[in-house]
C-alpha cells in the first residue's frame, strides 16, 4: 500500500478517546547520552553494504530568518570551543546540495516554527518569503510548531499550504515571488498528531506521513514520520487558539507508532516540536534535560530516531529507548544555524532499522561557501519588496501620539491603541478562522496594558506627526508602532472581575513601594480612582462608566485586550477568569489596517481616567510610582524579537 492510501486510511479520525487509552508510561531514570553513533561500525561507509541507506536532513525553528540570524545566534560553538559563523538560506542551499550528493534515499524535513518569525520581510508579508525559500530548498514535509498557529489553523492550511489569498484586513495578501509569479503555497505538507479541534476532537492536520525508499530488486520500503506539536500551544500568547487543543505527546506518539507498525511500516521517525538542552557543543550532548528528553526515554521502542525543536538548542546524541537500544536524539538549533543529518540503514528484506548502524551529525550552516544564486535572489527580492511596501502610505495623521504617562496613567498613544482594540474586536473575523464564535460578538470595552509589570506593552513607539497638516503614515511606521505578533482576544468577564483588574493596577513592590501599572481604556469608558485609598480599594463600582452606564459587578462584559493580558501574563490575574474567548486578528496585521480604515488619525480624547481627591496629586507619588514603559531593544527587527531577547537576558526560557 502506497503512502497516500495509508495516510488516507488513518486520516483525521478522532484522537481524544484513542490517545487517552494508549499506555505509554514506563519506569526510567535520568541518563546521559552516549556518542552520536550507535556502534563503531555505524560511521563506517563500508557498513552500508547490503543495507538500504537512508539520509534524514533536518532544520528547525527557522522563524523566517532568510538572510541571516540575529547577531546573538550568528555564531555557534562546536567541539573544543571552536566557533562558526552561520546562517542564511543561500548558504544552506549550497550545503544541502553537497550533503545530498550521491544519496538516493534522502529526505529533508523540519520539526516546526519555520515561519511566523521575526525577520522583517517574512513578518510583514504573510510569511510568503519563508515558504518560497523552503520550496526552493526542497523541503519535503514539516511538523506544525506553535508558531505555525500564530494566525489560525485555517491560515496554515488554506494560505500556507494551498496558496489561497489571505485578506488580512486588506493589508496582507498574495505577493509576487522572486520569479514574478503569485504565491502558490507550500510544495510540502504540515503534520501534527496531537493538535486537534477543541469541538470535534479531530486532528486539524494529518498525524503522520509515510515516505518510500528504493530497495534492491526494484522494491520500495516505507518509513513513517510521526509529528508532535508542543503541548499548550493553544494558550501561548502568539498562538492563542480557543478552538484548538493539544493532546498528550507521549500518548499520541505511541498511538501513531502502534498504528504504523500495524500497517507494516518497519522504520519510524518522531519529529516533535518540543525540545531539550544538552550542553553547549552543537554536535554532541551532555546532561540532557527538558520535556523532549523525558519523552525520548519513554516513547515507543518502535521509534528509531527522535528529532526535536522549539527550545532553540543544539545537540546530537544517542539515547536508549525503553528497551535499552540506542537511537538518535537530536536538535539543530534555530534560525538556520545547522543542518542535522541522521543516517539509517534498513534491512533490505524486512525494512526495519539496523540500530547498530545508525549515526547522526549536526553540520554548521557556515557562510564560507558560495551562496546559491537562486536562493540569494529569493532573499534579495523579498527584502526589496518589503522595503518598498513598508514605505507605502496607508493613512495620514493630524496629531501626535505619545507614550508619556500623565499622573493619572493616561497617554495619548495608550488611548489611541485602546480605541483600535475596540474597533478590531468589532470587525469581521479572519476569513480562514473557522473556530466557534461566541454568542455575543464584538466587545463592550477595551483594556490595554500600557506599562505592565510583567512582559512588554503592545505599544512600541510614539507616533509623532511632522510639521505638515496631514502628515503621511507609512505601513512600516504603523507596523512598528504597535504589536508583537499576537492576537487581540475578547472574552466575557464579570463586572466584579473587571473591577478587580482595575484594582490590580496598583501593587506594592518588593521594597514596599506602591507602584502603578496603568491600563488604557477605550473612548466609551470613564472611571476615577481614589488616590488616598488602600491597595485593592481605589476604584468604586459606581466610579466606572461604560457607554454612559455605571458598571454593575454582577453583569457580564465583553472585554477585548491582548492575549498576554487576558491570560494573566501582564500582571492582571483577575482577567484570567474569563468565558467564551474569541480570537481576533494579529496586532501587527490589525493596527495598520485600523490606520488605513480611518484614513486620518485625529487627536484622541483624554480625561478617560481621573483622580480624586485632586489635591492628593501633590505630591505625585500619591497615585503610585508609575511603571516605566520599556524601550524596544535597539537593533532588533521587531517587537517579538525584542521580547525574546529580554526573556533570554532575564534568564528565562522563552516560549519560542
Per-segment meaning from a language model:
Residues 27-35, 501:
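Hydrophobic membrane-targeting alpha-helices
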Residues 50-95, 101, 131, 135-136, ...:
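Catalytic centers of hydrolytic enzymes
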